[in-house]
Amino acid sequence: MGTERKRKVSLFDVMEDPSLSSKNTKSNGLGLAAAAGGGSNLINKWNGKAYSQRYFEILEKRRDLPVWLQKDDFLNTLNSNQTLILVGETGSGKTTQIPQFVLDAVVADNSDKGRKWLVGCTQPRRVAAMSVSRRVADEMDVSIGEEVGYSIRFEDCTSSRTMLKYLTDGMLLREAMADPLLERYKVIILDEAHERTLATDVLFGLLKEVLRNRPDLKLVVMSATLEAEKFQEYFSGAPLMKVPGRLHPVEIFYTQEPERDYLEAAIRTVVQIHMCEPPGDILVFLTGEEEIEDACRKINKEVSNLGDQVGPVKVVPLYSTLPPAMQQKIFDPAPVPLTEGGPAGRKIVVSTNIAETSLTIDGIVYVIDPGFAKQKVYNPRIRVESLLVSPISKASAHQRSGRAGRTRPGKCFRLYTEKSFNNDLQPQTYPEILRSNLANTVLTLKKLGIDDLVHFDFMDPPAPETLMRALEVLNYLGALDDEGNLTKTGEIMSEFPLDPQMSKMLIVSPEFNCSNEILSVSAMLSVPNCFVRPREAQKAADEAKARFGHIDGDHLTLLNVYHAYKQNNEDPNWCFENFVNNRAMKSADNVRQQLVRIMSRFNLKMCSTDFNSRDYYVNIRKAMLAGYFMQVAHLERTGHYLTVKDNQVVHLHPSNCLDHKPEWVIYNEYVLTTRNFIRTVTDIRGEWLVDVAQHYYDLSNFPNCEAKRALEKLYKKREREKNESKNRK
């Protein structure tokens, strides 16, 4: 059966065959046939249980992955270097296999006896962190949340037994705030680095410094594109490894003329493929939940109208706020023919750009690429950050077309012209750090003790104006003093996994005797939309929403929904009957509990104003204003709203619950579409601006507008009241 290993195993030197327990150390192990036959007698080294039959079935597939052939080269290279850049096409197996190779090597190393190390693998998206960790737990034949776990915002599925942890890049950044040297980790893997998310870019600079202070820590940067040379240069010439994908040729088709309606064109193309092309699943890229759900309905309807002349279809949506169980449906097989020998069934996945690189879906032969994605954009001059539907980059187009060649030669239908591809698309997607509001990032860096932001080692430094705006916002919120140092309030704000305005609102809520209510509002704002509006029952859904409506605005409407949910014992049937999203409500309840724990840690009082008091809703609105005083709009005589200070013309979003047009409103979100909308709005009083945020509403540097004149009157009124009060004394 082969010779036994004689030499001592050192870190990253070799990796044991994962089909063997730590007690069975034959160099070639058992052949797969023997392993399958006697698998029940082999002990899983991770949990001490017998391996299941499924483990060996999966192992056979793992050994077919391109990355498997390079595991020895990978471990040897990492053993000799502190940092390694690895480029691998989506489908090469890098996201699932590299962390397991590393974990095996860490566990096999005897140099740290008694020390429990973690291997961390970051993902830019929550969906990927959850989905990949479940897959890897399956491959290792362990329970998710035990030896393998994941950590995303407001959800920690790990335990004291966890050795391999998939987490969003934002969560690793939060861990660094509590543990600046990330002492629990032996190896950190930054996956999907080409996506250049805000958190990943900050982690680049942070980990570069941590590596200097921790020679025992190793870093693997994994990318799906060849921009990796830039990573190499940034990490001082770290070695670069390339793992080939398993791509078959993909034929690219362009449109002759630009499409006026890419959604309609995408649906039309799906139907044409299903009618005319050989069997094979279809992947359609669209920009967001609403668009995807609309497309799924229309595709089902169009195919249904074709009757028996075509095979059955299974249309599956995929976007970040979809429940995990629904997300897993993308891995289901295509439906079988309706009759024996009849037309083949086909799976049609309609996805956001999450399917570009984060997840690999086998069986895809046809890709439909309209050439758009939602991207974050930020204008620091007017302090507006919004998601805009924008053209993708050439790199993204390449990733999308590559999804079609995973299992056999495929076809990609680009719903734009070849000229547009060559002349209009940028080579790479702009890093998020160059198009984002950096207030939260600056707060995180300050908490990490990084004061010199201008000289922080960003791979692509943000514009100075964007940094200055972030510092200004944090100063107005009281998170930074005038010298730019973190205040006590800022320390507490940084502990909340929320935007700075919401954190400030929570911290000051006890002063307004309404922290219980502000906790509920914050939780509701942190989860997907709680209102369900099915196309076939829109009128009934709108009537149900109106029953929760509060005349003073949307924040109080959300509070009403949360209270009703709790009063009805969190009953899913109540949610269904009232067109309320049960999953969103469960998430809100979970988020609220976590926020309560943070409040308790800082001895922030839990309190409420008497519900029957006239001040009940007034206090809640004042507390909200204390956080969102920079997001105020004023009703002009022309009938439209103007954002205060920035003078942007905006309109109340049609989804609002107000029964009137208040003179002043705070808003939670600025939405750029065909018109500029403010969404989630609440009525406030002008005099509260003077009382709650006088430091911001300094009229000496205010633009000349109706809001300024209204505020001047309010200041004069306050001055008169003060003088009258003095005279009475």
Curated annotation (Swiss-Prot):
<keyword id="KW-0347">Helicase</keyword>
<dbReference type="GO" id="GO:0003724">
    <property type="term" value="F:RNA helicase activity"/>
</dbReference>
<feature type="domain" description="Helicase ATP-binding">
    <location>
        <begin position="75"/>
        <end position="244"/>
    </location>
</feature>
<keyword id="KW-0507">mRNA processing</keyword>
<dbReference type="InterPro" id="IPR048333">
    <property type="entry name" value="HA2_WH"/>
</dbReference>
<dbReference type="Pfam" id="PF00271">
    <property type="entry name" value="Helicase_C"/>
</dbReference>
<comment type="similarity">
    <text>Belongs to the DEAD box helicase family. DEAH subfamily. PRP43 sub-subfamily.</text>
</comment>
<dbReference type="GO" id="GO:0008380">
    <property type="term" value="P:RNA splicing"/>
</dbReference>
<dbReference type="GO" id="GO:0003729">
    <property type="term" value="F:mRNA binding"/>
</dbReference>
<dbReference type="InterPro" id="IPR007502">
    <property type="entry name" value="Helicase-assoc_dom"/>
</dbReference>
<feature type="domain" description="Helicase C-terminal">
    <location>
        <begin position="269"/>
        <end position="449"/>
    </location>
</feature>
<dbReference type="Pfam" id="PF21010">
    <property type="entry name" value="HA2_C"/>
</dbReference>
<dbReference type="Pfam" id="PF04408">
    <property type="entry name" value="HA2_N"/>
</dbReference>
<dbReference type="InterPro" id="IPR001650">
    <property type="entry name" value="Helicase_C-like"/>
</dbReference>
<dbReference type="Pfam" id="PF07717">
    <property type="entry name" value="OB_NTP_bind"/>
</dbReference>
<comment type="function">
    <text>May be involved in pre-mRNA splicing.</text>
</comment>
<keyword id="KW-0547">Nucleotide-binding</keyword>
<protein>
    <recommendedName>
        <fullName>Probable pre-mRNA-splicing factor ATP-dependent RNA helicase DEAH3</fullName>
        <ecNumber>3.6.4.13</ecNumber>
    </recommendedName>
</protein>
<dbReference type="Pfam" id="PF00270">
    <property type="entry name" value="DEAD"/>
</dbReference>
<keyword id="KW-0067">ATP-binding</keyword>
<dbReference type="InterPro" id="IPR011545">
    <property type="entry name" value="DEAD/DEAH_box_helicase_dom"/>
</dbReference>
<dbReference type="GO" id="GO:0006397">
    <property type="term" value="P:mRNA processing"/>
</dbReference>
<keyword id="KW-0378">Hydrolase</keyword>
<feature type="short sequence motif" description="DEAH box">
    <location>
        <begin position="191"/>
        <end position="194"/>
    </location>
</feature>
<dbReference type="InterPro" id="IPR027417">
    <property type="entry name" value="P-loop_NTPase"/>
</dbReference>
<dbReference type="InterPro" id="IPR044756">
    <property type="entry name" value="DHX15_DEXHc"/>
</dbReference>
<dbReference type="InterPro" id="IPR014001">
    <property type="entry name" value="Helicase_ATP-bd"/>
</dbReference>
<keyword id="KW-0747">Spliceosome</keyword>
<dbReference type="GO" id="GO:0016887">
    <property type="term" value="F:ATP hydrolysis activity"/>
</dbReference>
<dbReference type="GO" id="GO:0005681">
    <property type="term" value="C:spliceosomal complex"/>
</dbReference>
<feature type="binding site">
    <location>
        <begin position="88"/>
        <end position="95"/>
    </location>
    <ligand>
        <name>ATP</name>
    </ligand>
</feature>
<dbReference type="GO" id="GO:0009941">
    <property type="term" value="C:chloroplast envelope"/>
</dbReference>
<keyword id="KW-0508">mRNA splicing</keyword>
<dbReference type="InterPro" id="IPR011709">
    <property type="entry name" value="DEAD-box_helicase_OB_fold"/>
</dbReference>
<dbReference type="GO" id="GO:0005524">
    <property type="term" value="F:ATP binding"/>
</dbReference>
